[in-house]
């Protein structure tokens, strides 16, 4: 049986959606193709252990996993989760109905815990462009991805949570972010401000430029009133 899940590959700040094709047929052995690096190749061992600790079985037949497009290098351990779910779906151990509706990423630990990934925001942006219903990601990455509106973003902590959701046994809490409210909540107010320093416009301008560009400033000597106040304001 052939099942498709979807992940994503990062190239700099750009994401490319990856189709994870899993086919189970007569025979033995596990084949992972599609230009995977060593971390991706090691996924079999993490997935097998996660299955065992969560009451599932690695099919005793020939398993072929293709990461498409095959000419793009696949790096990292974040493909563990989509590969694992593809294997479970292809072996009919879970429902495969929702697998192609979401972009799914996450590293699996041996006990089935889902570990964080990198690049949740560009992955979410690309998923929205391609019309996916949403994303299933590690809980630590959910808020970052949820900044992209119109997507259903679900943060998960374990493999079992994802399986229960796909089987319709339990609902996941959708992560939503109000970016406007977050901005105001994180706005910082200070008791003092540059407008309380009279004159010294050239010094204030230099410090503003340094702060905007993230440059270091060395204050050698200030021979005027406010000599302590100005460096303090810049530090704030």
PLM region descriptions:
Residues 1-220, 227-232:
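Peripheral, non-AAA+ core regions of ATP-driven protein-machinery
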Residues 235-236:
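Post-Walker A helix-loop "phosphate-sensing" segment adjacent to the P-loop in P-loop NTPases
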């Amino acid at each position: 049986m052939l099942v498709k899940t979807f992940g994503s590959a990062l190239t700099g700040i750009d994401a490319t959606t990856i189709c994870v094709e899993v086919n189970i047929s007569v025979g033995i052995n596990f084949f992972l193709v599609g230009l995977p690096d060593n971390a991706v190749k090691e996924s079999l061992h993490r997935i097998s252990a996660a299955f065992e600790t969560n009451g599932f079985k690695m099919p005793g037949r020939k398993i072929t996993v293709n990461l498409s497009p095959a000419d793009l290098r696949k790096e990292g351990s974040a493909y563990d989760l989509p590969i694992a779910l593809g294997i479970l779906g292809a072996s009919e151990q879970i429902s495969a109905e929702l697998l192609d509706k979401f972009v799914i990423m996450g590293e699996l630990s041996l006990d089935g815990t889902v570990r964080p990934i990198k690049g949740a925001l560009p992955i979410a942006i690309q998923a929205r462009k391609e019309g996916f219903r949403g994303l299933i990601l590690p809980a630590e990455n959910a808020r970052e991805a949820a900044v992209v509106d119109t997507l259903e973003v679900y943060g998960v902590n374990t493999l079992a949570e994802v399986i229960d959701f796909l089987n319709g046994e339990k609902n996941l809490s959708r992560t939503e972010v109000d970016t406007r409210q977050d901005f105001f909540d994180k706005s910082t107010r200070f008791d003092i401000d540059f407008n309380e320093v009279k004159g010294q416009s050239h010094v204030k301008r230099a410090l503003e430029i340094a702060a905007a560009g993230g440059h270091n400033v060395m204050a050698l000597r200030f021979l005027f009133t406010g000599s302590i106040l100005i460096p303090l304001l810049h530090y704030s």
